[in-house]
């Protein structure tokens, strides 16, 4: 029933987007990465607030409502075709509603009805391989490493280092900006340091402008475990449907979106709001 409802919402989102005007290459509140870099010598700063209902942590067994604030992103345009990215957050708080049996539950130092930690830092590089042309999409590669900043003891971290590589493509067709990602993630097993799990990553987003300043956006983004049988906790398949909008004035942009989990371990629903500021900061030789 839940999958059926989400399919209806996704179809309605695509239909609504198909009635608007095109949008350029932008990011928040979307997760699917556009292959276009921000430009040589430019810096992109973004921040936001996420509220997630029924967030699960299979490795620690904790479950509850999650607040992430602030979520932060910082990108540097190191050339006309390359971008260096840092994404993370300063404070994650989980209001615990359930404690389920889990392999790493014995490591928890949480005694009350809440726990908090920082967000794992993701360091990434995006390199555009081909600019968009009349008859072909723009293309890029993105390499990312997720560092183990959040801890097992808080129940919010896995203490693993993960690596991702993805192929990015985008095309503006008439009034539609369509972006697709496909890639591979190598996730450390939090229960056994000698093992890992490979996941297939995917993302598909659409964006349309309703006015010169406002857009509506939507996407499906997630990962699929490739391991035969039950994957290690924390490396399972995940997916999210995002529906939202953006409003841009000059170098500033405000955004907001509702998101819905596509798997049993994803949050049932949630909301994200944030801002983006882009400016020219330095010259690239």
What do the PLM-derived regions correspond to, one by one?
Residues 20-22:
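N-terminal signal peptide c-region/cleavage motif recognized by signal peptidases
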Residues 1-11:
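Bacterial N-terminal signal peptides that target proteins for export
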Residues 24-285:
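Transmembrane beta-barrel domains of Gram-negative outer membranes and organellar outer membranes
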């Amino acid at each position: 029933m839940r999958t059926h409802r989400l399919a209806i919402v996704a179809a309605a989102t695509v239909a609504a987007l198909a009635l608007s005007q095109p949008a350029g290459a932008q990011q928040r509140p979307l997760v699917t990465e556009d292959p276009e870099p921000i430009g040589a010598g430019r810096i992109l700063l973004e921040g936001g607030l996420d509220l997630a209902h029924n967030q699960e942590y299979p490795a620690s067994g904790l479950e509850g409502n999650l607040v992430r604030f602030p979520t932060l992103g910082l990108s540097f345009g190191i050339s006309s075709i390359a971008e260096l990215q840092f994404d993370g957050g300063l404070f994650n708080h989980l209001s615990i509603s359930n404690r389920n049996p889990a392999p790493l539950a014995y490591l928890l130092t949480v005694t009350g009805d809440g726990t908090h930690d920082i967000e794992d830092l993701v360091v990434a590089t995006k390199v555009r391989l081909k600019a968009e042309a009349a008859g072909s999409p723009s293309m890029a590669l993105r390499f990312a490493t997720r560092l183990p900043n959040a801890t097992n003891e808080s129940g919010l971290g896995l203490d693993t280092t993960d690596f991702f590589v993805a192929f990015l493509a985008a095309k503006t067709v008439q009034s539609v900006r369509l972006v697709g990602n496909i890639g591979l993630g190598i996730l450390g097993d939090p229960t056994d340091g000698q093992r890992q799990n490979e996941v297939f990553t995917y993302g598909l987003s659409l964006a349309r402008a309703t006015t010169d300043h406002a857009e509506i956006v939507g996407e499906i983004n997630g990962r699929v475990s490739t391991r035969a049988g039950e994957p290690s906790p924390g490396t399972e398949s995940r997916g999210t449907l995002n529906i939202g909008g953006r409003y841009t004035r000059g170098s500033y942009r405000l955004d907001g979106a509702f998101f819905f989990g596509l798997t049993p371990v994803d949050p049932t629903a949630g909301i994200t709001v944030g801002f983006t500021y882009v400016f020219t900061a330095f010259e690239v030789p």
